Amino acid sequence: MNALPSSAEFSRAVGGDAVSREAVIRIEHLSKTFSDAAGPVLDDVSLTIRRGEIHGIIGRSGAGKSTLVRCINLLERPSAGRVIVSGREITSLRGRALRNARRDIGMIFQHFNVLSSHTVAGNVALPFKVAGLPRAEIARRIPPLLELVGLAHKADAYPSELSGGQKQRVGIARALALDPSVLLCDEATSALDPETTDQILALLRDINRKLGLTIVLITHEMHVVRDIATRVAVLDHGRVVEEGATFDVLAFPKSAVARSFLSGLVAHELPPPVAAQLLPAAVPGSDPVLRIVFTGTAAHDPIVADLVSVFGIQPNILHGRIDYVGDRPLGVLTLVAGGAGEKLPAVLSHLSSLGLVVEVIGHAVRSAVARRHSAAR
């Protein structure tokens, strides 16, 4: 492996405006149909992944995530459409040309695929041997890889002596052996416990920063996307239903699929017993229910106290949470604006002027919601 770039070199490589807009992977109108499937597994998927991004692709089981990532390096050949990686149309290649192109695309999997009969160093050496590198060159290049993934002290260990996280580190080192510019991660943390998952995500983030590596991360776990991805695409029934900066998708999800993934992570959705009490329109004795999204410094402002002191509102908090996406705070608060009445337009205008995103999501008879909310707790 080449020497790691300095921070200045890495900044020039992935930080400039011109380069950061460069598309490393372009997926154009991609479709895939299997002979035994009722319909297309992928249906007219288009996606652009830029240099240095960690791009998450999330979806339910069967959404087509793994098929999509396997089409990027042509482990699965698409039925229609194009995949372009680093300026080369991968889908037009076969034989030796395809094998050479794949050297620029590393891949790790949910199951670690380490050979039990080989040591850690022996497993990492495999891509070098397939590429025909001399033995001395292989011996020179293995130690920096093991150092990068935190396994320098395990070079002579066998897989039976390793934890699951250490086996995945072997997989990462092996995937990076031929200096790829792209790393595909297909459910790479799904078989790991939460603590080990966090460690592997931290390693991937570190590798992304040090090497300027573009990472495509397939997962069904939104917290993985929250913790590491710069952008995210939401896949459902073989189609991209939403795509954007991770913070924007988490803060302002547009699709029902994204909102369902966020239900345990960001408080966009009310608990079902409370949601069941909401009315679609105002009735006598009801109050508006507001969902307020806080971002940046507004996530820490005393908004509820402000509503009481400025407008005399009697707020009843139904649900809320503050989380962090990267280093940016994101809060979602749902409350009944008790006594808002004719003051509601002024309340909404005031909250908007503070940089908050606010919407009326329904109405509620306060006493009924309070009773049900108390029971739900």
From Swiss-Prot:
Pfam families per the UniProt record, alphabetical: ABC_tran, NIL
Similarity comment text for this entry: Belongs to the ABC transporter superfamily. Methionine importer (TC 3.A.1.24) family.
Free-text function comment from the UniProt entry: Part of the ABC transporter complex MetNIQ involved in methionine import. Responsible for energy coupling to the transport system.
Key word Metal-binding present: no
Keyword Cell division: no
Catalytic activities: L-methionine(out) + ATP + H2O = L-methionine(in) + ADP + phosphate + H(+); D-methionine(out) + ATP + H2O = D-methionine(in) + ADP + phosphate + H(+)
Keywords assigned: Amino-acid transport, ATP-binding, Cell inner membrane, Cell membrane, Membrane, Nucleotide-binding, Translocase, Transport
Gene3D superfamilies found in the cross-reference section: 3.30.70.260, P-loop containing nucleotide triphosphate hydrolases (3.40.50.300)
Top-level taxon: Bacteria
E.C. code: 7.4.2.11
InterPro entries xref list: AAA+_ATPase, ABC_transporter-like_ATP-bd, ABC_transporter-like_CS, ACT-like_dom_sf, MetN_ABC, MetN_ABC_transporter-like, NIL_domain, P-loop_NTPase
Subunit structure of this chain's protein: The complex is composed of two ATP-binding proteins (MetN), two transmembrane proteins (MetI) and a solute-binding protein (MetQ).
Binding-site list for ATP: G59, R60, S61, G62, A63, G64, K65, S66
A single GO cellular-component term on record: plasma membrane
Organism this protein belongs to: Rhodopseudomonas palustris (strain ATCC BAA-98 / CGA009)
GO molecular-function terms, A-Z: ABC-type D-methionine transporter activity; ATP binding; ATP hydrolysis activity
Entry protein name: Methionine import ATP-binding protein MetN 2
SUPFAM superfamilies xref list: ACT-like, P-loop containing nucleoside triphosphate hydrolases
Domain ABC transporter: 25-262
Subcellular location: Cell inner membrane
Topology versus the membrane: Peripheral membrane protein
